[in-house]
Amino acid sequence: MGKFKLRPDEIREMTPEERREKLKELKAELLREMTSKSISGVPDNPGRVKEIKKNIARILTTEREEELRKIRETEKG
């Protein structure tokens, strides 16, 4: 499913729509990985689940940073 790690600068370069789409893809992939783990007992790639979770967290963190930046800008004037 492509490269594993999304770098923060790659995420910041994405539009909000692209980030939401990527987040949706990652959540679907995480669900597939967890399902295969529950069926077979062992995931195909154990490190992949951890990396998917980290990528989801990176995207959510970037979204929150953007949200806080907009709030600060409106408070300043």
Curated annotation (Swiss-Prot):
GO molecular function: structural constituent of ribosome
Keywords tagged on the record: Ribonucleoprotein, Ribosomal protein
Gene3D superfamilies: 1.10.287.310
Alphabetized Pfam families for the sequence: Ribosomal_L29
InterPro entries per UniProt: Ribosomal_uL29, Ribosomal_uL29_CS, Ribosomal_uL29_sf
GO cellular component terms, A-Z: ribonucleoprotein complex; ribosome
SUPFAM superfamilies: Ribosomal protein L29 (L29p)
BP-aspect Gene Ontology terms: translation
NCBIfam families recorded: L29
Family to which this protein belongs: Belongs to the universal ribosomal protein uL29 family.
Protein name per the record: Large ribosomal subunit protein uL29
